[in-house]
């Protein structure tokens, strides 16, 4: 294997991670659909090292090991290891989770099947729509005679139920995991906990309960979230166990943390118990890295644009805080756990261009993946992709090898597009490649609108931050489509997700179902309850090695107007909280989201929330020195706006801090290529981040 070992930016931090580090390296590894990226902070020299290797579907842990080998560091010298994985997502989408049983309250066996009145997939007008079935077969949905009232009173205890017989039945049925979901358990989980305790005495299987996953109102969403967790737990635990064994077998004895969907890191044990908290384990790292870029460059508001080989992920960052969603959907299943508000579409470098039945050109969502990959990879792929289109248009290098020693084959790309052209009445392949990019850009612009306009924000008030292996190639076109005034391209854009993982704080989310109309509540009661929550979370973080002065706790309340069925989260400060400030904050949030507020209506509190973080120190990335080197390494013709334009090719490592230039230009670096269209003005920040001004922005 050819070792790719490149060092660049220096990292200046007073003390790494806020703790004494006996060893040398901090490592972040992000597994994507096409590539596995690794970024490493070398503590002694404060340098960043990076590498990129192909992902291995079905063997993610092997890709992780290959990334470590490619980087060329000693495993024994790794002191912290954070990993983003797509194991949970893949298991659900491919329906390869565990055989799961549901133990529920008598009369609620079919809650998962009944669901809600709206379709979660398929579209409202799809006449061929077939509703996906629940993850638990009906014969494995077992009712028990228990009942708890909505106020938490135990109406029917569960002590007398025969769990020995139930355990024997589940064992004979080949069940691999169990979800215990009782009605109103959010108000009092006593019966659920007793059932879990009894089942664990009879079965050596994972058993989870709904109030332990989502202690909130709404049995359908709570049941669905718990069943998802049970369905995925054996798969996630098996992967994490294999990963730990393989890493230890190769000398890695440092703690291994997993990125959570909420944007923070968690221990292997936490990830094994809370599998549904890892659905966005990969994409959230990029958002975390983007937040760090914003902090270093004094940018308050940005929209992340993370384009890889398989998909594009976008998220909105307001006041350097990514938005959190508590009411989510994965595939056809509701998931009511906190995760970053990331919108994903099937448009990546490997997305396949194809012709629909009506003869129109389409791009994605199907992808060529890592194997065989785009035609230009020379690994047996024959279908035209977005990467092939970029190569045909001159945006990717032919002579220069990419990360991992990959050398692109333009002839293979042209052959793939020639076959596509035959289905479109012999269209010119250059124009066809340009059309493929335009279709992809339109879809990606729609994704940006989804997280901004649809949430009450104007994208023109934000910078567009492009990263991922393919993000910097397309982010400028998306910015022109939306009239976004500024594009930001960080250093190491292809490894920003790994950087976000490396720098991730440890995070814990807690929720308490408590509330009512404000006029009927006591402020002292609210404050006493959040004090209890804070002490519990403080103890958990202290147990994970974070001193009290390395912890941060933030509170919010879920509120709604009387008669509404949905809530909005309103931040609160313990020392400044009043009912008037809560009403005002909720009204402002409601108006921002929905365009109006109703000051005549009563407000209600539904939940209390706590977000706790164990803080790690963040390095400040800077160039070691300015230089007077010429970054231009060659020139070639690039297709822009319907014509071939002579364009300078720049080596990013040679670009001096505080230098400026005007496009067109191609900026090449390990792990990413930036395509700067004509007339865009580019400035190099001290951190190496590119600030690019849109000449076509609208006021």
Residue ranges and their predicted role:
Residues 41-49, 122-125, 135-154, 175, ...:
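Gly-rich Lys/Arg/Thr-decorated short loops/hinges at beta-loop-alpha junctions or inter-strand turns
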Residues 48-72, 108, 132-166, 176-177, ...:
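Phosphate-binding loop and its immediate beta->loop->alpha context
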Residues 98-152, 210-214, 500:
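Active-site phosphate-binding/coordination module
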Residues 61, 67-71, 211-218, 222-225, ...:
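ATP-dependent carbohydrate kinase catalytic cores
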Residues 38, 49-56, 101-107, 268, ...:
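Glycine-rich phosphate-binding loop of actin/hexokinase-like ATP-binding domains
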Residues 181-222, 612-625:
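Terminal amphipathic helices with adjacent charged low-complexity linkers/tails
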């Amino acid at each position: 294997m050819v070792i790719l070992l490149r060092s660049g930016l220096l990292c200046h931090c007073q003390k790494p991670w806020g703790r004494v580090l006996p060893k040398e390296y901090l490592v972040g590894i992000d597994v994507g659909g096409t590539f596995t990226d690794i970024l490493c902070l070398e503590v002694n020299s404060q340098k960043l090292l990076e590498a990129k290797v192909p992902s291995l579907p079905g063997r993610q842990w092997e890709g992780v090991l290959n990334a470590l080998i490619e980087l060329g560091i000693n495993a024994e010298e790794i002191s912290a290891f954070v990993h983003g994985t797509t194991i949970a997502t893949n298991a659900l989408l491919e329906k390869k989770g565990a055989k799961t049983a549901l133990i529920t309250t008598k009369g609620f066996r079919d809650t998962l099947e009944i669901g809600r009145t709206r379709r979660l997939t398929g579209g409202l007008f799809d006449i061929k729509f077939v509703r996906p079935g629940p993850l638990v077969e009906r014969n494995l949905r077992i009712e028990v005679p228990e009942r708890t009232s909505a106020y938490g009173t135990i109406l029917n205890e569960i002590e007398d139920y025969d769990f020995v017989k139930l355990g024997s039945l589940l064992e004979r049925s080949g069940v691999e995991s169990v979800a215990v979901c009782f009605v109103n358990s959010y108000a009092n989980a006593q019966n659920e906990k007793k059932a879990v305790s009894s089942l664990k005495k009879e079965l050596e299987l994972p058993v989870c309960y709904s109030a332990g996953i989502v202690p909130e109102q709404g049995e359908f969403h709570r049941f669905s979230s718990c069943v998802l967790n049970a369905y995925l737990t054996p798969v996630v635990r098996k992967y994490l166990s294999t990963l730990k064994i393989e890493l230890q077998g190769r000398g890695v004895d440092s703690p291994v943390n997993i990125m959570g969907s909420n944007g923070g890191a968690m221990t292997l044990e936490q990830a094994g118990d809370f599998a549904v908290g890892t659905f966005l384990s990969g994409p959230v790292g990029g958002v975390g890295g983007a937040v760090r870029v914003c902090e270093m460059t004094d940018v308050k508001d940005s929209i992340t644009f993370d384009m890889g080989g398989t998909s594009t992920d976008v998220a909105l960052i307001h006041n350097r805080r990514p938005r959190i969603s508590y009411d989510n959907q994965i595939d056809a299943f509701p998931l009511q756990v906190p995760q970053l508000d990331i919108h994903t579409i099937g448009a990546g470098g490997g997305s396949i261009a194809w012709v629909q039945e009506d003869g129109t050109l389409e791009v994605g969502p199907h992808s060529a993946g890592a194997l065989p990959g785009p035609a230009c990879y020379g690994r047996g792929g024959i279908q035209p992709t977005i990467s092939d289109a970029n190569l045909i248009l001159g945006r990717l290098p032919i002579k220069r090898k990419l990360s991992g020693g990959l050398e692109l084959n333009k002839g293979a790309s042209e052959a793939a597009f020639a076959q596509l052209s035959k289905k479109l009445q012999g269209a010119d392949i250059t124009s066809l490649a340009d059309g493929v990019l335009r279709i992809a850009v339109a879809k990606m612009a729609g994704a940006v609108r989804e997280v901004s306009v649809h949430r009450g924000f104007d994208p023109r008030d934000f910078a567009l931050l492009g990263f991922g292996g393919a993000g910097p190639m397309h982010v400028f076109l998306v910015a022109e489509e939306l009239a976004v005034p500024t594009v930001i391209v960080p250093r190491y854009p292809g490894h920003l997700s790994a950087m976000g993982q490396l720098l991730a704080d440890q995070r814990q989310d807690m929720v308490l179902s408590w509330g009512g109309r404000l006029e009927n509540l006591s402020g002292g009661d609210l404050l006493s309850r959040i004090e209890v929550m804070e002490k519990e979370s403080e103890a958990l973080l202290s147990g994970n090695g974070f001193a009290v002065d390395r912890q941060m706790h933030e509170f919010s309340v879920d509120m709604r107007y009387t008669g509404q069925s949905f809530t909005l989260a309103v931040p609160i400060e313990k020392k400044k909280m009043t009912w008037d400030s809560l009403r005002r904050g909720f009204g402002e949030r409601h108006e921002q989201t929905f365009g109006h507020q109703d000051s005549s209506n009563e407000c209600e509190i539904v939940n209390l929330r706590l977000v706790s973080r164990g803080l790690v120190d963040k390095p400040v990335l800077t160039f070691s020195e300015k230089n007077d080197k010429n970054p231009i390494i060659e020139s070639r013709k690039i297709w822009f706006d319907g014509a071939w334009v002579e364009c300078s090719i720049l080596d990013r490592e040679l670009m001096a801090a505080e230098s400026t230039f005007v496009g067109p230009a191609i900026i090449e670096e390990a792990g990413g290529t930036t395509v700067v269209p004509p007339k865009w003005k580019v400035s190099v920040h001290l951190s190496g981040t590119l600030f690019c001004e849109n000449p076509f922005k609208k006021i």
